[in-house]
């Protein structure tokens, strides 16, 4: 009986790891430009899910401790024209679209690696309803 319970727990954990791994997901982000003074929401794809990681109890200075996160492996960029911007202003906005994901180190040059970032729906202006 105990072996059956242990096997069920093991299979459940395996399923949780395999079925909820790092993968593409649809998200809605708010985009804004200073010249336009409002936000619009657009749909794009980004990476989300779980990556195996561990934090050592005893830190070894000779061995760097890098936490792996679900992040993009490949990106493309799409450009849209924001409606309602002032004349003679640049109304084009380019945003990233993830096409492939993996578990890897967070690249702070291109990604918000903070624990509590502003989030994809943050907007400093009022939102324009289409």
Swiss-Prot record:
Its main location: secreted. CDD domains: GHB_like. One of its GO terms (cellular component) is extracellular space. It holds the Pfam family Cys_knot. Transmembrane segments: none annotated. Glycans are attached at residues 26, 43. GO terms for molecular function: follicle-stimulating hormone activity. Gene3D superfamilies: Cystine-knot cytokines. The keyword Mitochondrion does not apply. Keywords: Disulfide bond, Glycoprotein, Hormone, Secreted, Signal. One of its GO terms (biological process) is regulation of signaling receptor activity. Residues 1-19 form the signal peptide. Disulfide bonds join 22-70, 36-85, 39-123, 47-101, 51-103, 106-113. It is found in: Secreted. Together with the alpha chain CGA constitutes follitropin, the follicle-stimulating hormone, and provides its biological specificity to the hormone heterodimer. Binds FSHR, a G protein-coupled receptor, on target cells to activate downstream signaling pathways. Follitropin is involved in follicle development and spermatogenesis in reproductive organs. Belongs to the glycoprotein hormones subunit beta family. Heterodimer. The active follitropin is a heterodimer composed of an alpha chain/CGA shared with other hormones and a unique beta chain/FSHB shown here. This is Follitropin subunit beta. It comes from Mastomys coucha.
């Amino acid at each position: 009986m105990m072996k059956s319970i242990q096997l069920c727990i093991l299979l459940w954990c395996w399923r949780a790891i395999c079925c909820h791994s790092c993968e593409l997901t649809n998200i809605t982000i708010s985009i804004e430009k200073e010249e336009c003074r409002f936000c619009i929401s657009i749909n794009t794809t980004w990476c989300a899910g779980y990556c195996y990681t561990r934090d050592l109890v005893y830190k070894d200075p000779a061995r760097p401790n890098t936490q792996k996160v679900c992040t993009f492996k490949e990106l493309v960029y799409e450009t849209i024209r924001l409606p309602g911007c002032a004349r003679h202003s640049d109304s084009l906005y380019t945003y990233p679209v993830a096409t492939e994901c993996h578990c890897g180190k967070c690249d702070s040059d291109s990604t918000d690696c903070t624990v509590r970032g502003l989030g994809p729906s943050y907007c400093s202006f009022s939102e324009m309803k289409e």
